[in-house]
Amino acid sequence: MNCLFYFVPVASVIALFFAWLFYHQMKKENEGTPTMKEIAQYVREGAMAYLKQQYKVVGIVFIILAVLFSVLAFGFGVQNKWVPFAFLTGGFFSALAGYVGMRTATYASARTANAVSKSLNSGLKLAFRSGAVMGLTVVGLGLLDISIWWVILNAFVHEASESQTLVVITTTMLTFGMGASTQALFARVGGGIYTKAADVGADIVGKEEQDFPEDDPRNPATIADNVGDNVGDVAGMGADLYESYCGSVLATMALGASAFFGDVDAQMRAILAPMMIAAIGVVLSIIGIYAVKTKEGAGLQQLLKSLSVGTNLSAVLIAVLTFVVFYMLGFGNWWQLSLSVIAGLLAGVIIGKATEYYTSHSYKPTQNLAESSQTGPATVIINGIGLGMISTCIPVVTIVVAILISYLCATGFSFDPAYISNGLYGISIAAVGMLSTLGITLATDAYGPIADNAGGNAQMSELDPEVRHRTDTLDALGNTTAATGKGFAIGSAALTALALLASYIEEIKIGLQHVGTAVLQVGDKVVNVAEATIPQIVDYYQVNLMNPRVLAGVFVGAMMAFLFCGMTMNAVGRAAQKMVVEVRRQFKEIKGILEGKQRPDYKRCVEISTKAAQHEMVAPALTAIIVPVVVGIILGEAGVMGLLIGGLGAGFILAIFLANSGGAWDNAKKYVEDGHFGGKNSVNHHATVVGDTVGDPFKDTSGPSLNILIKLMSMVSIVMAGLIVMIHG
């Protein structure tokens, strides 16, 4: 059975090889005219300058946290000695994936614009395969990190029994998710603040005050806006999904080791299954990537169908092969567990389709939102908020159904508390299923900003109108894939956070053993800590709704979602104000900009966004890290469980609302720009621009950042469980 593990590192190497191949194929393409190259260079320099500055800040935070974890591990003995090192590698690989994705995207945009001048299909394939570099790098590095730690810990960790060794190994591996979570938080929050400070600033002065079109080279903030697309939607999205991907696999491994404690063969099967499904998903994603192509002159719906062919092919194949994996591993309930995986896969598809329905201007909700512009910006805002609230229904019901189906399939269709560990394993394997085709799913997400930048490059380089029409078509597709990608990221974050919540209970068991607690008094029974089940741990800490500590934690967790959103929203507002002041200053002081005779000072706007993002991201990030520790110290283990439940419930629903309201406002504006309700530069268009400007931080800063918040709070709780147990017992 152990031989099957080696397929996992092989799959990671295959993913990284194809990422390298697609990158070099992209670099061989012509970058276009000297103007196109110059604009691409501006964007590339701005993106890399931001990334360099961000990694300096993140590096300092990582050093401080690594020292703290070292003190807890080597000084107080409340953590495994490997935790500080696992934490650092998790952050390093996440940062490396972001760097590779950003570098690829900034090189691909001008080449995509140039390829589109030949044919629409050439542009689509180039942009999509460049996006695939990000997708395959994330899954490749994620599986590589998991493989390395599995080999290292198997060689060095030896507990009293083989069963206990597997539990310690998997719970230790789970802590490298803390590194990925911390890096993801800074990438998402910092990237979101950067991109929306530039975007909102560019829109307020450029579109609303000067009637400039999108990506007008006369707008000083336009380069910063294009840099922001890469910073937020490539590096930020990549770090977010890297965290979910690794977190779901690692949580499933930890829950599998716990659920089948005492039966080493069953433990090994449960540990290998998520790694095998993820590895097979990598190979099938590559097959799906090669299936993406389109006809010349294709419209938005045809392009969407082209991308769907690749993602659907990968999803169908993984659904079929999941049955083979569980059967080969020797699970008695192999077909039921396969249904748990399929439940996760289908949930991802349904959430994506629901997001598309509520945010694409091909459907009634966004068309009706555009129609409301006839009575001014106030009704656009009101209807957009209402649309976002209603849009939460389908994703929430979908996740609820997926949780119940995956739980029941894993327990033999029983709610008996004796099988709760098996049920939680089923839920976590559903999260792995949802993320199994991340290689191609993330490719469609990263495609969006590449196509958007290609359109911006074509506009600023004043290319032929036909080329710009083609880049606009690819850009419209990118907006839709970006919106559905956000829905997918939120759904996967919810399932992953639920799996991490269950893993927190396992980490408490390890913490109890570290402080020397051998047995627990649970009701009338005396239970060995190493063999205690999840219901027994929950019972011991009185985790129920009658416990005021749990209730207090739930309220604090729900509040955290709104506090975090408020902090990130205000951060964008403050940064955008600085950008607006700078753009107005340039229009006033640099003569000839408005006439197109003098080039604006793009670099100054890039610097403003970079500094604002670095400064403003610190407070929300520290809040997310510190609050779970403070709640644990004050309210104990039961309070932390309440915190995680409250944060997950409120954060998941709020994230969907923000992402879909913002996406609908964006596409309502585009629907008007396509000639409906007065078209560009009409009064109605100005009303939708206001909606789009308000929606920018909704969909690209606060909404996506909540994904990280609900996972990071779980990860912080897991890593600090030993300290909380030492304080409270």
Write out the residue ranges for each language-model feature.
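Hydrophobic packing and interface segments
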Residues: 1-729
